[in-house]
């Protein structure tokens, strides 16, 4: 059975995302922010069943998977795979400057 391990930084970022989404009024109800982040957690926990690709740059993990949360936002989850363990190293989205470094051969 596969095991999903999230680094503390990833958990912190997702927990902070709940507050950011609500405070910046992306969602009118805090419950909607919780649901949005829970959907990301659900996706992460399904990593073993998903098609994933090698990252172009290994700084934050060997592999990545993309999760399309809505028509405007795609999340990129990077991880290492060690046997039956998936170790989630980092999460970012297409609204950041850093995400192309995971999916293309851009020099850092």
PLM segments and residue spans:
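Enriched for short, Lys/Arg-rich terminal
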Residues: 67-108
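Basic, Lys/Arg-enriched alpha-helical interface segments
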Residues: 1-66, 108
């Amino acid at each position: 059975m596969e095991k999903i391990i999230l680094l503390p930084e990833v958990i912190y970022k997702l927990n902070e995302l709940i507050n950011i989404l609500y405070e910046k009024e992306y969602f009118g109800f805090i419950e909607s922010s919780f649901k949005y982040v829970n959907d990301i957690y659900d996706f992460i926990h399904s990593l073993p069943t998903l098609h994933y690709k090698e990252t172009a740059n290994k700084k934050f993990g060997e592999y990545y998977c993309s999760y399309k949360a809505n028509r405007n936002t795609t999340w990129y989850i990077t991880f290492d795979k060690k046997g039956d363990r998936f170790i989630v190293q980092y999460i970012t989205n297409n609204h950041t400057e850093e995400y192309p470094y995971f999916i293309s051969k851009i020099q850092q």
